[in-house]
A protein has these predicted regions:
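C-terminal/domain-terminus segments
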Residues: 151-185
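Terminal amphipathic alpha-helical/low-complexity segments used for targeting or macromolecular assembly
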Residues: 1-57, 114, 185-201
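Short secondary-structure boundary/capping segments
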Residues: 4-5, 51, 130, 136-137, ...
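Residue-level recognition of short, solvent-exposed, well-ordered loop/turn junctions
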Residues: 8, 139-141, 175
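Flexible, glycine/small-residue-enriched loop-and-beta-strand segment within the central core
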Residues: 65-75, 80-156, 183-184, 190-201
Length: 201
């Protein structure tokens, strides 16, 4: 089993292998390129499609951005991200349509064992010793707003139309149509028509 296949199978994997470093190097290099180009340059956004798993036709990243793999992330139509997006997409990350990210959002679909010698000196079946990681997918539904300084951990699903309040750390699933916030993030209440701001037009 290749190292990337171990990630998707939920097994411990060695992120230092050349197989994985080559995938990450491509994403890191293209992110650096994106981050140095003027935001009015028409070629800037096309760089995203050179490393992302898939993305809709309409999207905008304010930047700077940092994807770990890029190819493990799949984004729908009409996506927007504000400043400083970090995507640790060791496991696959799925983002729906019409999703908005505030500044400093981090998606962390990777983890390390709690036991120290497993974390820093794991002996693998082939005999080599290295650090170890494991990863869990993140699923974000349609029409979700993730506000500033939010961290979303692996294994989490956020339902359609949910709003994640600023500064939250999302460790468990959030249901559709809910306002959720806190550390750890918890569903606070359902979003209703009483939340409408149309009167401000």
């Amino acid at each position: 089993m290749r190292e990337e296949e171990k990630i998707f199978a939920g097994k411990l994997f060695d992120a230092r292998t050349k197989e994985l470093r080559d995938i990450k190097h491509k994403a890191h290099t293209l992110c650096q390129k994106f981050n140095t180009i003027d935001e009015y340059d028409e070629d800037r956004l096309s760089i995203i499609k050179e490393f992302i798993g898939n993305i809709g036709e309409k999207y905008y990243f304010q930047g700077p951005i940092q994807f770990n793999y890029g190819s493990h992330t799949f984004i729908g139509e009409n996506f927007f991200s504000n400043f400083n997006l970090t995507v640790m997409d060791d496991a696959r990350i799925y983002i729906g349509d019409n999703v908005m990210f505030g500044p400093n959002v981090s998606l962390m679909a990777t983890n390390h064992p709690l036991i120290a010698n497993e974390r820093v000196a794991m002996k693998y079946p082939d005999g080599h010793v290295s650090m170890s990681e494991y990863a869990d997918e993140i699923h974000i539904g349609n029409n979700v707003w993730v506000a500033a300084n939010v961290v979303i951990l692996g294994g989490v699903t956020i339902g359609d139309n949910a709003v994640i309040g600023a500064g939250s750390v999302v460790t468990k699933d959030i249901p559709a149509n809910y306002l959720a916030y806190g550390v750890p993030c918890k569903p606070i209440r359902e979003i209703t028509e009483q939340d409408s701001k149309i009167h401000l037009l």
